[in-house]
Amino acid sequence: MDGDRTPEEQIEIAESDQGPQLDDNVELANVFSYSLDQRIMEGCVISAILEPRGLETIVAVSVTNKIIIKDKETSLNITETIRCIAAAPFGDGYDCIIIGTDSSVICYDVHNNLTVFRNDVPDGVSCFVYGKLGELDEAIYCGGNCCIWGFDKTGANTYWTVTGDQVTTMCLSDYDNDGETELVIGSPDFEIRVFKNDLMRTELMETDEITCLAHVANGCFAYSLNNGTIGTYVLKERQWRIKSKSNVSKIFNFEEEGLMVVVWKQGKVDLRFAHNGEVLSRDSVSSHVASASVSKKGDESFITVVCLDGKVKGFKIQRAQNGSIDKTQQLIREFGQKKHNLMMELSNYEQEEQLADVEKDRDFRIPVDTEVAVVFVVNTELQLLSLRVEASHNIPIRGVLIFAEGLFEGESYIWIPPNEYQSRSVIDIPLVIDKDSTNDLHTKVFLGQVDSNKLMVMENTRILPKFCRFTLLREEYSKFFYMPTAYIQFDINSRAAKLSEWVQESFTIDASLVEMFDEPEGEFKFMGLRPKHEKSLMFKISHSEKTCKIYHDKIETMGAIVQSYASFYQIQNMESVAHFPDVFKEADEILEEIDPMTEVRDRLTAELQERQAAVKEIIIRAEDSIAIDNIPDARKFYIRLKANDAAARQAAQLRWNNQERCVKSLRRLNKIIENCSRLRVGEPGRQIVVSCRSAIADDNKQIITKILQYGASV
């Protein structure tokens, strides 16, 4: 993609439309450097205007849990452990510092030296983003443990929603180009979630933990993963992806629309095009990076990189002084490489012509018309899906290299035949699928005779169906079918006249059996393959009544099937009736526990406060006894202090255990509601979430199970 890519980076694959035509004759120039004289906490660096009519300055958190402000001799001491910081324009023409700790959110006004507000946040805050979300007013949004809070400049709670996992990074971006920004969040469960106001709109599955998100262009956001991958999305389509051995510290857009800055933890700073990832310029710092930010001084913007050792280096974009010369040299290098490749190819042809027939026979030549077939096969007895590779003319397969996103560890798999399989021309490679997602399998097959020192490489690409973990059962294998107890029922849409088209694309099924799904009536049993070999699936279709009933015990898989069906036939809205006895029973149990757990939490909180007050009182009395030289009473007070301290610790532990149980229950309840909403499509699915939240807020919990089963129209 870019001519000067370093060896550790590997470009993956990304066809994209031509992006904005920007001047690429630019470079990063170092303009300033200084030191904060403190070691800096990773990820805790911002740029903010802290005084009226002031300039932007760097604010960072030291490893000693102090907030350092450049050019100020004093630092801010926070008693709680700081996790993240941000800046928000809550002052009159200046910014306030937003501090996220392990138990609260603090808004601090440096200009007036006061705390604007402090709000308790259970389980702490891990990331911030400030801005306007949808129709809501501007606020600071705080990502925590499975929850997101929003606070305005007075500290009032203006937003709250639940997520499926911990929130590690967030950004605001106009995801669907409707003129309103959406909240994009990343989690350790490999998912990027997009929220429209307080309702989840889209889920994007990645291959590792999401570490950074940033809006970089209109309708486009960038992401980075824990394995060193960076890329961009426009809607649900990934535009490009690059993988590096280093990890990303920060991504942000810079000045012009379509440019993005990527700062790597090991010190590299890249200026890239957002639409294709091409590098315009690259520079570096000498030590590991804590974080980076964009700051303005007058009309100029600067990239400020802060290292872990406190050293700060600033860059700006300027027109390259030797850009035309560099381009000419790059073209010369490219043409020189092409010339070298052509000369090597010509040399091979010349050597070929000089070989005698006897030498060619000894060279174990492969026939010109050799072909390699790559297909999916199912071993019903072993309940296993395999990738079969077969070479024509009985040519031995000497090795297979498979690339597949998220399927193998490291995203690649190498098969080398053992000694007894050296001469085989047909091999089966087992595939164990953990997730329901469409995947491209890129294979490179190495062919050659056993004694040959030359191998022929043939490439092939196969699409792995989304629900390849299920295969249609024939009558003779009905013993492998387990009748599920859960099901959903919905009306067949007029657009879905031919279910066979969707089934053929989404499941592992023999092409000769696909047409059965277009018959007026039918029951079709699917067997689950490993590792889900104990989960069966059945379709009961009646085209005359225009109904479809799907039996399966896994609600997550059922939701994925419904969404895939609706997406294939472009169905905007769809109702369904769901029957999941175990799931609904679990939801009822959680709802019954909420009120008692809340009461216990309040009681434990009050008890803990009493214990803490008693400890403080005893400490004061003990110190007073020492001050008047009453050592016997002081000894008694310290003995009492030890007992009360142990009791306070026990009360705190009980409160923490109750809080953890409450959070887990609420997280599970939210997941159940989210899964049930995915059993519907469009507005009916969104109304499930809205109705359940309203029922909980109104203390009308008894109707929640009915909403989950029959929809929000009950």
From Swiss-Prot:
Component of the BBSome complex. The BBSome complex is thought to function as a coat complex required for sorting of specific membrane proteins to the primary cilia. The BBSome complex is required for ciliogenesis but is dispensable for centriolar satellite function. Required for proper BBSome complex assembly and its ciliary localization. Required for cilia biogenesis and both the assembly and movement of intraflagellar transport proteins along the ciliary axoneme. Its main location: other. This is BBSome complex member bbs-2. Disruption phenotype: Mutants have normal body morphology, but with reduced body length and width, delayed larval development and decreased roaming movements. Defective cilia structure and function. Disrupted assembly of the BBSome complex at the base of the cilia. Residues 332-361, 597-627 form a coiled coil. Signal peptide: none annotated. Expressed in ciliated cells including amphid and both inner and outer labial neurons of the head and in both phasmid neurons PHA and PHB in the tail at larval stages L1 and L2. The keyword Protein biosynthesis does not apply. It is found in: Cell projection, Cilium; Cytoplasm, Cytoskeleton, Cilium basal body; Cytoplasm, Cytoskeleton, Cilium axoneme. It comes from Caenorhabditis elegans. Part of BBSome complex, that contains at least bbs-1, bbs-2, bbs-4, bbs-5, osm-12, bbs-8/ttc-8 and bbs-9. The keyword Transmembrane does not apply. GO terms for cellular component: BBSome; ciliary basal body; cilium; cytoplasm; membrane; motile cilium; neuron projection. Gene3D superfamilies: YVTN repeat-like/Quinoprotein amine dehydrogenase. Keywords: Cell projection, Cilium, Cilium biogenesis/degradation, Coiled coil, Cytoplasm, Cytoskeleton, Protein transport, Transport. GO terms for biological process: cilium assembly; non-motile cilium assembly; protein transport. PANTHER family: BARDET-BIEDL SYNDROME 2 PROTEIN.
